[in-house]
Amino acid sequence: MKEGFAGLRGVALVVCASLVAGCVAPAISATSGLNGIEHILVIYAENRSFDHLYGLFPGANGIANASPRLYLQVDRDGRELATLPAVWRGKNPDPAFPAGLPNKPFRIDAPPINLPLSAPTRDAVHRFYQNLEQINGGRNDRFVAASDAGGLVMGYYDGSALPLWQWAKDYVLADNFFMAAFGGSYLNHFWLVCACTPEDHDAPAELRAQLDE
């Protein structure tokens, strides 16, 4: 579960995304093979990790495959956290989440929290440098430490009531889809389509990033 809602290292490095791909109207042609496909739709779920919504999907590489080696989070100095930090709502702890949650994934829509999918929660940070720190060389153990939402990044839902869940059953669910670029989904949209980073060589000076060396 990684990215905006991050969490399980190794299990879902889908930092920023779950992917559902399917062929529209799969029975429209008797032609076999690729020639029988008229359209392919890709649903790229922005700012979501795989486990955040699909961690309980039957047969998927999700929560059931998690082990402490894969999900335990550390602080910025590399020390294992005894418990998850508070879940933040603005500048204060969110009263909907109890303090001292165990250092592991937790259900948001189950006791003791019981927040439904319809309840808004904080949009966790999903920027380039924070994401680089969160992934931590592939260990994926600093999503909590480098988050502005505290322990929320380890939360997940039972997504079976969502229409997306049924679409995943009807078509294809990519449970080992990995993002191509650090940060949010906008840049990853380009990488999904063209495996490239867009550049504006004619951008005015005030819009160009200046590197301090």
Give short role names for the model-derived ranges.
Residues M1-A12:
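Bacterial N-terminal signal peptides that target proteins for export
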